[in-house]
Amino acid sequence: MASSRVVLILSISMVLLSSVAIATDHIVGDDKGWTVDFDYTQWAQDKVFRVGDNLVFNYDPARHNVFKVNGTLFQSCTFPPKNEALSTGKDIIQLKTEGRKWYVCGVADHCSARQMKLVITVLAEGAPAPSPPPSSDAHSVVSSLFGVVMAIMVAIAVIFA
């Protein structure tokens, strides 16, 4: 009986922890892709980027490209040499280190006038996600409290069963 309890606890732990360990592919711009006149700041605002995740840039390679730049080049929309551009139309960038990351399109005025630029903050692999802004919605508070109470009840039931 005790061994089945241990197996159950380990199984539940593995399921809960596996969601943390799985890398995420972030499709930049979602269904719009990497294009002009899109608010990438707004797009990135509710996303959590972690070491091991991927950024996927989908775009028409005849019209756009992707440069990874630093903060200074990002602000001024200045680009490295053209041969450093990613230009396949389906570029995948693995986020290997934590910190700020900057990406721009180097075609014409796409960065400076058409907002084709993205800045993100990459968190360490196991770091907790930033807290969302406080909600005034009483329903979300009740839902969260209900989830915590249910998790505690299940844990107690497993331990004392």
Swiss-Prot record:
Record: residues binding Cu cation: 64, 105, 110, 116
Induction details: Accumulates in roots, in a RAM1-dependent manner, during colonization by arbuscular mycorrhizal (AM) fungi (e.g. Glomus versiforme and G.intraradices); the expression level correlates tightly with AM development.
Transmembrane segments: 141-161
Signal peptide: 1-23
Record's keyword annotation contains Nucleus: no
Keywords linked to the UniProt accession: Copper, Disulfide bond, Electron transport, Glycoprotein, Membrane, Metal-binding, Signal, Transmembrane, Transmembrane helix, Transport
Record: glycosylation sites: 70
GO cellular component: plasma membrane
Domain Phytocyanin: 24-124
Gene Ontology molecular function: electron transfer activity; metal ion binding
Disulfide-bonded cysteines: 77-111
InterPro entries, A to Z: Cupredoxin, Phytocyanin-like, Phytocyanin_dom
Main location: membrane
SUPFAM superfamilies reported in the protein's UniProt record: Cupredoxins
Coiled coil stretches, renumbered: none
The name this protein goes by in its record: Blue copper protein 1a
UniProt source species: Medicago truncatula
